[in-house]
Amino acid sequence: MKSKCVLIFLVVVWLFNMGKGIGCESKVNAEMNISLSTWVWDTKKWMLNQEAILEKLQEKKVTNVYLQIDTDLLPSVYRHFIQQAQAKGISVYALDGAPYWIGPSGIEEQEAFFNWITAYQAEADDQQQFSGIHLDVEPYLYKSWENNRAKSILHYQYVISQAAVQSHELHLPLAVDIPFWFDGVPFKNSNGSGSLGQWVIQYADEVTIMAYRNHADKENGIAEITENERRWGRVLSTPIEIGVETMASDEGEYISFSAKGEEKMMQELGMLLTECQAENSPSSIAVHHFDSWLQMKP
């Protein structure tokens, strides 16, 4: 049975009433039950400034942190942080993964990660333990994706299926990042056939859709590009989280909220939640990533 460990907290979602002319004011139009998550990649910097990151996470009303594991840091550093975070209602997931995990050295890297987590969990008190595993593999960035797609997909599925077994042995939920376009990636192999996106949603306990667009509705907006994943999540009882980008991007002006600012991002997320309330609403919103989020203009 899948472990459903998504914590839903009351977060004020700002909608903005954009009037005409000068003097337009923003105001709260609605309150919705939704949790906020974020990725923390610069682990060493923040683990040496734990009071600062906890204060900022609370300011942003974050309830789930995906913390990349830096094994150069002592386990005691993580124990202290997680205990303080949990006391503030913040769950911490162990984050790792890389495109080369589907390559020849991937199995060894994955084993090393889970061995570290296993040893850590065994030594940590309940209030110091990770709340889940969060994988960000991005197999499409590995060199074999273009010249041997079928083999790459099969190796990726092995990574995810093994991670599911390893996570459940630790009694932890497995969360997986996938891009929104995985719904259109077909596969046919020993794992069956169908959409790769649907397969991941079936295998993982939680899935974050990297829906990197800076508008909620209209054509090619967040709501439209995540429609299939949200529907599959409802059918398969897998919580679907929607991820948005705050890093500057050279892939197009429609990708990131970096230039638009935090107020505009919250406005669009409010529109997304309003549109999705009737059917297949996301379980949570994830902001990528913590450092770039902090650097956004208001």
Please place each PLM-identified region on the residue numbering.
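Substrate-binding cleft of extracellular glycoside hydrolase catalytic domains
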Residues: 45-46, 70-155, 262-266
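Aromatic-lined carbohydrate-recognition surfaces of secreted/lumenal glycan-active proteins
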Residues: 39-41, 93-100, 156-193, 238-249
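Aromatic- and acid-rich polysaccharide-binding/catalytic face
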Residues: 62, 67, 192-222
